[in-house]
Amino acid sequence: MRRILLSLLIAAFIGISLPQTSFAAVRTIELIEKPHQLIDGKFLNDDLATLLAPEGRIGSLVFTPAPATTRWVIDGSFLDEIAAMADGYELADETDGQGVEIAAAFLEQLKIATAGAEVTSIAFGNPDLILAKQLAPSELLFYFSYGAERVSFHIGRAVAIDKSFSNEKRSKVSGLLRKNYTINRQAISKLSTVVTAPELQLFRARLAILLSPSINGDLSERFAQSAVDGVAAERAKLRINPGKYALTSETVDVPLTLVNGFDSAVTVNLIFRASNIKVLVNDMRQITLAPNSRTQFAVPFTVVAAGATSVNAALTNSKGQWLGPSSQLALTMTLIDSRVAWFTTGAAVLLFIGAAAQTYRRVRKGRR
C-alpha cells in the first residue's frame, strides 16, 4: 500500500513540475498548392481566388487564429502566384482575374498569422526531390535558396529551409518532358551567366514546377509548352537584329544593332561565322549593353571576293557558350576596281565641265 501511495505522489509531483507547454502538440500548416499560373505568367483559371477567400480551403488556414505553437511550411512559388494575383492578372482565356483584393488581403493576413511562429520554406515550386536530384542536383540547391528568399520577402522576416520535406507522391513526367526540362533549364542557366535581372531568376526558378508531382498528364504537357514558349521569349530579349547589306568597297563598316531587353546591363561577346571566305570579320569581345537598350555598332568587314554570302552572328558568354540562336546577315559584295573607279569619276567630271561650257556659250549667244 505504501508503494502505491509513493508512486502516486511521485507521478503527481512530476505532473506539477513539468511545464504545460511540453504537452502542447505542435500544429503544422502547409501552404503548398498545385500551380495555378503557367510559366508565361497567365493563370489557368480563377479557382485560386475561391481557395484564398477567408472561408476557402486555404484562406481559412490563415484567417482562422492559430495557436502560438503552429509551424508553417510554405512554398515560395505559391506566395509568388498570390502576389501576381494581387498586382492584377490575366487568365489563359485572356479575361481578367477577379481575385485581386482577395489575394492582397491574404498576404497581409499571412504576415499577422505567422508573426512569432516557426516558418520554414521548401524547394521553390515543390519539385519531386528525388527526380530533381537526378536531373539537376545543383539546380535543386538554387530552388531551396530561392524558395527561402521568396518566403522571407513576402512575410518580412528570415525563415529556415526544410530540405527534408517531400510529398508522398512522385512526379510522373514522361521521359520526353524530362528532356525538355533539361534543355530549357540549360538555356536559362547560360543566360543567367550574364543576366542578373530578377525576372530571369524568377523564370529560372519557376522551371522547377515542371517536376512537381501535382501536375501530370495533359496539365504537364500544357506547362511544358508554356516553358518552351517562355524560354524562347527570354532568349529573344538578348539578340542581334538580322539584316541585308551591300558592300561596294574593300573595307566596309556594317551597322549591327544589338538588343538587351532585360532590366540589367549585360556583358557579352559578339562572334561571327561566315559561310565562305568571301568576307573577313573579327569577333568583338566584352561588349557591355545597357538595360533595356538598342545599341548600334559599326563592325568592319573586309571584302575578299565579289558575290553573295551569309554570316551568322551570335552572342556568347565568357566561356564561349551561345546565349541564344544566331542571327543571319545577308551580304552582297560588288567590288569596283580602283582604276575603273578613277576612270568613271574622271569621265563624269569631264561630262560635267562640257555641259557647263555648253550652257555658258548658249547664255552668251542669247545676250548677243
Feature map (PLM): residue ranges:
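N-terminal membrane-targeting/anchoring modules of bacterial envelope and secretion proteins
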Residues: 1-253, 258-259, 268-291, 295-298, ...
